[in-house]
């Protein structure tokens, strides 16, 4: 197994003084108005991330007037929303999906997770680079390929080449955010799995409401809550990549405490920026933006156990998937993952750090195929 390289974990580099097309206008007055509507660039986001310059609320409210009541100036004069308000966050997501990803009909039932789009699409950009790296180095020898990292940030292509990619999203939730963004950003095809039939019914409704998604997203129900890939990957399936955002917590109590902690941090952050601190207790847990259904938030053993199970099962499907990947929120869980990956015989392991504002997370990627086998997979991809 190739030892995880620190180079693969390099943090994204942000360019200072980057001029945004959104901030250009024909007059100084127009410049001031547009600048006021756009938040500061989000540090650490991938160079191809459309949201590096924040949110253009003027455009967002124009395409989705439902967002308008939630948008207010903050103490710095920038337009923003209350990110502790789940309805505001849902309205923002719907507007972003419509403006930037041409998805017109998107909704989720009350009480389901409403993920922030900038961080979610970052995952897709980085795994695109992982897949592009396979093709870029497919003609190199295994010795040359050993330890090969994801291309550094400053070499990421501005206009990525088209690749016929089939991806598997484990635990897609009711929002199906990864398939939606992957289809509209890169033209990938997806299979999306979940243990919750309500979530999958909602995903089907989203697909049926958007012609651009038809025929590109298939949903599969996981009937065994103890399994990850088994029962989902069929004998004739071949996936270029698998994605997963594992349940973070080990119990409902831990999940509830985490939600309350995040809500408190948001309130304190708003207070530090000049907002009047008016803590409000939600009527129920489902009203927290950090709420969610059991399968979305927690599982027995938490993230560490989920990753262990995923790695163990991945060996069974070693030749059916080019790359397996997962987000890893807790850095301390990586060492156990590396140990298990060595035990099951993974040939290459990569860890890709992602920075989103003050939040650090990482993508763990592994493959059971040799570099030359991965090169052939890319070359003969259907």
From Swiss-Prot:
One of its GO terms (molecular function) is 23S rRNA (adenine(1618)-N(6))-methyltransferase activity. PANTHER family: RNA N6-ADENOSINE-METHYLTRANSFERASE METTL16, SAM-DEPENDENT METHYLTRANSFERASE. GO terms for cellular component: cytoplasm. It comes from Shewanella woodyi (strain ATCC 51908 / MS32). Residues 8-24 have a biased composition (Basic residues). This is Ribosomal RNA large subunit methyltransferase F. Keywords: Cytoplasm, Methyltransferase, rRNA processing, S-adenosyl-L-methionine, Transferase. Belongs to the methyltransferase superfamily. METTL16/RlmF family. CDD domains: AdoMet_MTases. It is found in: Cytoplasm. The lineage of its organism: Bacteria, Pseudomonadati, Pseudomonadota, Gammaproteobacteria, Alteromonadales.
